[in-house]
């Protein structure tokens, strides 16, 4: 792909990369490649659409802490369920690997920039206030607990739509806002003696402020449509505040990449029609762009098709359809080079491009298609003479192979040249963690020569090198954890940017299968009747 920075007129301090939907892994996988490439060019931090306070745990892992395991970093270090995305696992591991042995000035930092809330509700501020008090050595837990009262008052999702049920403007909530403000002052007063750990404590205090602000907004007596826009706007304002604070903290180390949904990063206001009424609000990107000017750049994400989400190919007359014409590989395109086109039909699964989004963007990342197991199977079946067997009870296959796909050339079914699997075999083949939702693996018969060219050692030496590989990492050609001895390699969830390499390796594996079939045919022809 074209280098991202080459498309920008001015090198930004905050580079935003958007996705039009949550759920298409290809955007996260390309984000990972982009960030690691930017790290080589001086970027030192990444901020994701995830709870900023929770992100402190993920960053502990990234910094090499032995107190935070990878599992904990993923379960507690992300909000919105994003820790379950396989690409986010890879991001944390790659950042930790980069940081190993590097000085502070070159280390990568992980940030969340969302507030600890969802659009439909927010928690109580208690844990954030208590953690701030503990850092300061203050005991205000009794006072805070009395004001919090029943946690159910804060977690009532109906309060988002019924202001009379919200606790946000009660006397207790008002007093808690005063306490949060007092704790912020105490943090600054005590900064000289508590410099170590101060930034994390500040994040905890600001998280308390954020949820209290959101609860107050939920208590405003507004009509339903205005209410939604107000709450969405408050959330984006909190995101913008976090981004500006993150940039202030990171300014001396290098630029920051921020990754989120397009609607949070675009320069123009967000709009929505609810019950026939148009509502709008300034997103985080609109706020930050107005304050940072050309120090902020935004690349919006564009999606052609997504097998995983059930989104088909776009019409040729749409923005996405026209972007498909130049290449079926992911690419960055200057926004100014994209001609006018039709807006794709609205689909609740993702946000299509429109002229306003393009006009306010610096560039577009277009992904023509995501990749799933069925799409790869079709690619393999398009090769000459290929047949597929999917094991099941009807054809007498063993239970452990049910649902896998085996690809052969000719009638010999003893050795497939490629397989696609989506589940572990406990005790034998579980290093790829294929039991994660949506995860699959492509396995290919590379042969000894290609195997050695890729990995630097012959198949017979695999066990000596096993510990060098992370078999669960996406987008990486590795020896097959179970069949490397026979020259097999594998790739977990290859993204669309790897399709050319997949085609190259498929050609090798398919060619080997064709040769075997032709040799067998010649031997059969030489046999006497």
Where do the PLM segments sit?
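Charge-dense, helix-prone N-terminal extensions
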Residues: 372-529
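Structured catalytic-domain cores with a bias toward divalent-metal coordination
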Residues: 1-374
């Amino acid at each position: 792909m074209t280098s991202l920075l080459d498309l920008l007129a001015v090198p930004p301090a905050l580079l935003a990369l958007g996705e039009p939907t949550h759920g298409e892994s290809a955007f996260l996988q390309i984000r990972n490649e982009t960030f690691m490439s930017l790290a080589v060019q001086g970027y030192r931090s990444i901020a994701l659409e995830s709870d900023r306070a929770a992100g402190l745990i993920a960053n502990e892992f990234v910094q090499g802490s032995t107190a935070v395991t990878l599992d904990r970093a993923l379960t507690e270090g992300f909000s919105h369920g994003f820790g379950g995305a396989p690409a986010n696992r890879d991001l944390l591991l790659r950042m930790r690997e980069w940081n190993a042995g590097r000085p502070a000035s070159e280390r990568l930092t992980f940030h969340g920039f969302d507030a600890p809330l969802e659009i439909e509700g927010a928690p109580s501020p208690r844990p954030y206030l208590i953690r701030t008090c503990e850092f300061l050595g203050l005991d205000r837990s009794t006072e805070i607990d009395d004001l919090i009262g029943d946690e159910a008052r804060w977690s009532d999702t109906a309060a988002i739509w019924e202001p009379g049920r919200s606790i946000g403007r009660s006397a207790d909530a008002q007093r808690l806002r005063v306490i949060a403000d007092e704790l912020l002052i105490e943090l600054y007063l005590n900064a000289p003696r508590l410099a170590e750990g101060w930034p994390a404590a500040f994040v905890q205090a600001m998280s308390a402020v954020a949820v209290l602000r959101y609860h107050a907004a939920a208590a405003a007596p507004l009509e339903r449509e205005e209410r939604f826009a107000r709450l969405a706007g408050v959330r984006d304002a909190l995101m913008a505040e976090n981004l500006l604070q993150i940039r202030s903290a990171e300014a001396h180390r290098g630029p920051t990449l921020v990754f989120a949904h397009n609607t949070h990063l675009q320069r123009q206001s967000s709009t929505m029609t609810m019950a026939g009424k148009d509502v709008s609000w300034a997103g985080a990107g609109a706020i930050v762009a107005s304050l940072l000017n050309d120090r902020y750049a935004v690349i919006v994400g564009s999606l052609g098709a997504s097998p995983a989400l059930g989104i088909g190919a776009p019409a040729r007359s749409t923005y996405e359809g026209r972007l498909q014409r130049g290449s079926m590989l992911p690419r960055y395109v200057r926004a100014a080079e994209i001609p006018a086109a039709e807006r794709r039909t609205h689909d609740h699964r993702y946000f299509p491009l429109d002229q306003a989004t393009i006009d306010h963007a610096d560039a577009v990342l277009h992904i023509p298609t995501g990749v799933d197991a069925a799409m790869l199977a079709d690619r393999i079946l398009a090769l000459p003479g290929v047949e597929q067997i999917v094991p099941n009870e009807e054809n007498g296959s063993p239970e452990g192979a049910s649902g896998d796909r085996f690809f052969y050339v000719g009638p010999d079914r003893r050795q497939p040249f490629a397989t696609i699997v989506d589940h572990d075999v406990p005790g034998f083949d579980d290093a790829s963690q294929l039991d994660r939702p949506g995860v699959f693996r492509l396995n290919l018969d590379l042969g000894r020569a290609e195997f050695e060219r890729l990995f630097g050692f012959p198949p017979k030496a695999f066990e000596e090198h096993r510990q060098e590989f992370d078999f669960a990492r996406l987008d990486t050609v590795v020896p097959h954890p179970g069949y490397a001895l026979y020259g097999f390699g594998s790739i977990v969830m290859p993204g669309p940017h790897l399709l050319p390499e997949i085609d190259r390796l498929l050609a090798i594996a398919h060619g080997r299968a064709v040769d075997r079939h032709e040799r067998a045919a010649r031997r059969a022809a030489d046999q006497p009747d």
